[in-house]
Swiss-Prot record:
Glucose-responsive transcription factor that regulates expression of several glucose transporter (HXT) genes in response to glucose. In the absence of glucose, it functions as a transcriptional repressor, whereas high concentrations of glucose cause it to function as a transcriptional activator. In cells growing on low levels of glucose, has a neutral role, neither repressing nor activating transcription. One of its GO terms (cellular component) is cytoplasm. Its main location: nucleus. Belongs to the EDS1/RGT1 family. It comes from Eremothecium gossypii (strain ATCC 10895 / CBS 109.51 / FGSC 9923 / NRRL Y-1056) (Yeast). The keyword Transcription regulation applies. The lineage of its organism: Eukaryota, Fungi, Dikarya, Ascomycota, Saccharomycotina. The gene is RGT1. This is Glucose transport transcription regulator RGT1.
Amino acid sequence: MNGATATATAAVGAEEEGGAREGSRRRDSVESAGDGRRRTKVSRACDQCRRKKIKCEYQEDAQSCSGCRKNSERCAFERVPLKRGPSKGYTRGEGAGDGARETEGARGELDTSRADGKAAPVSLPPLHYYLPISNGQPGGAPAQAPAAPFPPMKQQFWKVPYYENQMQRRSSLESVNSDASGPQSQQETYAASSASTSSHQRTSRSYFPSSDGASALFQEPCSSSYPPPLVRSSSTGGQLQQLPAPQYPYSQFAVALSGSTSASSQSVQLRTSATGSTSLPEDSSPSSSNAYSPQLRAHCMSESLTTPTAGSKTGGSVKRRKRLSEPADPIVPLSAREPRQAGHIGLPLQAQQATGKTGVICGKLSDAELIDAYYEYVHVNYPIIPINKETLTNEILLVNTQPISEVHEMNNYILYWFRVALELLLHVASDKTNQDTASGMDSNAVHDGGLYAHRGDFKQNEEHHVPHQSQLLAALNDCFRKLLDIHPKICAYQESTSPKVTTIYLSTYIIINYMLAMLGEDNTFVLGTSVTVFNEFKIYRLLVLHEVADEPGDDSADVERHGFELLYKRLYYSLLVFDALQSCCFGAPRLASLPISHLVEPLFAPPPPLDSAKWAVESDAARREPLLASIRLGALLTELCETRVLAGALPRAPTPALRAPRPFRVAPPADDSVPGAFFHALAAQRALLDRLLAIPAHPAFAADAPPDATVDLCAQLGDAICRFTSCVLDTLVRAGPRPASPFAAALSRALHHAINLSRNIPTSLIGCIIGTAVHHSRDRDLIVALSRCMSDMIQIQGLTHCLRPCAPPRPRARVSCDLRRLYGHDGPPASPHQVMLHQFIDIAWRLLRNDELGWF
């Protein structure tokens, strides 16, 4: 339709030019005739009388009419005859005048002048010109208000220059679109500096694409991959001179670039003055313009992305984000941001506003700061992304997302939602209250208590924007749904998908499971889907055959392949850990039951040649040991599931003990770390449970047991309960009110329930020891230790109620003893001390049920 309009406009223009030239020739002929060729009849009025619309009384002798003589004007009849329609038999080819031929000649000269530029690589305008936008409405919709000069531009993660060989993909549909680009006078002339935007874009600090409408690309598989017709505006050509300079310091493409000051200022003006109404529906392609700054793109809560209308301007101005090399604070205060639509998560910088204490605002950290914050405060607690920062930023994240094919558009989609999940992870992993006093660090530094607390005014604003847990869960669910939407595409292009993209895609699932574990939520559905996705990639085969796999050779390609397989196995290891954590929390059977206790060192401290810095899980050796402690704690959870009583056949006859005490296969980490403290607390709880379950086999359980046997049993139980209480208190003190470990929420609740169930044991043991006739010095020491144990339990009660982000666990009013009714074989008590021992046995069965059927 645009092509037909352009053709008709050109034809009318040619006809008007031809008519004007014909009239000029007629006037020249009339002037040349002079006074010798005057009109001979008064069939028409003169020009002056026709203009004044009066009667023309022409007199032959005076050669003038009465009106002209009266006004002393020249009586002339020089009107050009009106052009009439074509005569019969008229054809367009025969009727083409000199004007049309001259127009074609002018066009030929213009094409000839551009012949030299066709042989060189062509730099097309930014992709956001491909979508016709009129006042925030799609092309064809009536405009309700004057449109902005052009839709605001988003910075692409990667730019690939367009060369002539890409024109081989043109089809008949594309040819029609290219012919409908509008008249030549309305097309924009781009400066030469815009041709280098591809090289400028490669060095950008942004590692993540910003396709707010990327999801619908994969909802319309039949859509054409060719760009729609160009819609350009000549009034905005000067603002597209140069993209921002590189900002990420780790990339191998981060080379210093020198740009003109005027182009840089125009780029800033472009990002900060976009106040027109622009609506980007979700069914738009990521190849279209990224209309917002790259630091803020999380579109998680809504199906469309809408910026404020032209009339909704705010007083605050959007500040430009500065580079990390500059001393100024790169964080933009919320007070300097424009309004944000309610109900949206992670709207762009120009569309943000404070939404109360329940809003989730993504994009407060740039891409570089986001990765830095993850490796500084999250990665040391558990390697969700199982690779060091240098390899991630310099290799894995360097993915081509230019929409030249469906595979590249898929890369763009995956990388975008990976960034969204990573920033939501920092929302979950950061505490925004009571952190300045807990940390002795400077208020201008980023620390574990406030990842975004760079300035005092920002912290003050941040207190009003603490996201509610329900909104965090809604954002996680939406991110998870977007991953499921793309999964069929990934399966279809699995052979042609880069291992980098596969690593990013699988890491996003691990991030979501990590966040749900941090929040203490039931993630059965998410975990089951994640296991299904991992199994479709056949990663379990790599893990099962790890010990018999071939060693990588000297070839770099072979080492690269084994390196990415190592990353896949690390990710599957983490998935098995979260599966075991889910099973321990809710008592559900494990979805994947592969043993991993023996794989801690081979996977995370591999032998050569995979022990190089490139494939190391952490490049800093000092931080590697705490990280391995968290990994060993995850392996302990899997072993707790494997050694369950209900996992095997339970005895139907009386037995001395349901489970023989034995040490764990996992090597215990150091005691001075938070994972190590949790590890030893769980081991102490298991030892106490085994000791209580073994009471029926002890000689003191007999009705006529001697006092010495009773005191000996009390000493064994006292040592077990004191050690368990001491480990739990040490764990909670080390973890603090905000445990950074993903297992902290679940393990703290498990230990809290265990303390509640066993809190009467010290008092009963003290009474039993005092009631016996035999008193020794060790008895007095045991009483002192049990008294200290009672004091520790009081402190534990207070510490467990200060845990965040999970709510403090409520004590269970009644824990049923179903297992004791099924498998207990002890008879009724026959003596007073047996009454106490039966109470201990009842506590043991309750503890066993808590371990076997779920901590929550």
